[in-house]
Structure formats: structure tokens, C-alpha cells
């Protein structure tokens, strides 16, 4: 089923961004960020979207597998988990969610990049607040 959906949306979808001949995607459930059949989150049953929270809480949106329900067009069913306790717990949730080793690796890589960006942002905020105090 996902092959049929990919053939329909590969050249025209709302998340498609082309830059210097390379096709990227802004799909929140994408695990690679590239416009490929493997990378698009809305064409597969599994996907993960990460959002930062307060005090090391990461809101993890997991795409639901609801093939038995009639789907409305234009909607993506997702459940949101707020995982407290750091990156290792979110990694455990992701490892339990994905069956394919390749997709699991891409999702874990997305988590690592997200965590690194959050650490840098928090360090920059601390440096700015120290500079304002002095």
C-alpha cells in the first residue's frame, strides 16, 4: 500500500521542498528529512516526531497503525507521549516502535541530532543570560 501512496505523492505533496536539485521534506514524521520512499513518514505506518519540552522532557509523537479504521483524507493519526528522564528513555520507546532495522537507525539518528541541537540551544541561552547579568 505504501508503494502506491509513494507513486502518487513523490512529485507533488505539501511537505516537498526542492533545493539545488535535491528534494527534501518538511514532514514532521519523516525519519530522514529527504523526499524518498523510505523517508516519508505519512506514507508509512510508523513515524516519529520530536518536540522539546521543559526540564529534559521530550514530547514524542508516534504515528498510529490504524489500518482497521476508515481514514479521513488530510489527517494523520498520532499519539503524543511526553517522556521524562532523558534521551535513553525516548530511545527505548523508538526501539520498541520500529520493526525495520534501517528505519530504527534513522529514527535514533534523528533523536541524537535533536538532542544535540537542544543542548546547544540551552548552552547559548545560559551564555546570553550570563552576559546580560554582567
Swiss-Prot record:
Pfam families on file: Ribosomal_L28e
UniProt KW keywords: Ribonucleoprotein, Ribosomal protein
GO MF annotation: an example: structural constituent of ribosome
Any one GO BP annotation for this protein: translation
GO CC, any one term: ribosome
Keyword presence, Methyltransferase: no
Family affiliation: Belongs to the eukaryotic ribosomal protein eL28 family.
Protein name: Large ribosomal subunit protein eL28
Native source organism of the sequence: Tetrahymena thermophila
